[in-house]
């Protein structure tokens, strides 16, 4: 026989006014913060990924594809020199 841990049931939590007051503020705030993080370009800076206009430069229009099985580091060095 299991004992009572003193925790509220899930149904009791999601039907309470306090739950919805807190979450009606936090869920939209997280959505807006994520949208601003991506739309301002901060996500590109934080994660180091190239922006959409930086994938192809004037000097390099081909896809940077590593084809050498035994010298991939040399090919990667060539690709990164063009950045």
Curated annotation (Swiss-Prot):
It is a single-pass membrane protein. Pfam families: Cytochrom_B559, Cytochrom_B559a. The chain crosses the membrane at residues 21-35. It is found in: Plastid, Chloroplast thylakoid membrane. GO terms for molecular function: electron transfer activity; heme binding; iron ion binding. PANTHER family: CYTOCHROME B559 SUBUNIT BETA-RELATED (PTHR33391:SF9). Heterodimer of an alpha subunit and a beta subunit. PSII is composed of 1 copy each of membrane proteins PsbA, PsbB, PsbC, PsbD, PsbE, PsbF, PsbH, PsbI, PsbJ, PsbK, PsbL, PsbM, PsbT, PsbX, PsbY, PsbZ, Psb30/Ycf12, at least 3 peripheral proteins of the oxygen-evolving complex and a large number of cofactors. It forms dimeric complexes. Belongs to the PsbE/PsbF family. This is Cytochrome b559 subunit alpha. The gene is psbE.
């Amino acid at each position: 026989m299991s004992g009572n841990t003193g925790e509220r049931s899930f149904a009791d939590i999601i039907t309470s006014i306090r739950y919805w007051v807190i979450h009606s503020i936090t869920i939209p705030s997280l959505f807006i913060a994520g949208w601003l993080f991506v739309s301002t370009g901060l996500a590109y800076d934080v994660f180091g990924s190239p922006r959409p206009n930086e994938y192809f430069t004037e000097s390099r229009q081909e896809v940077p594809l590593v084809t050498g099985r035994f010298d991939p580091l040399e090919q990667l060095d060539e690709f990164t020199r063009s950045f």
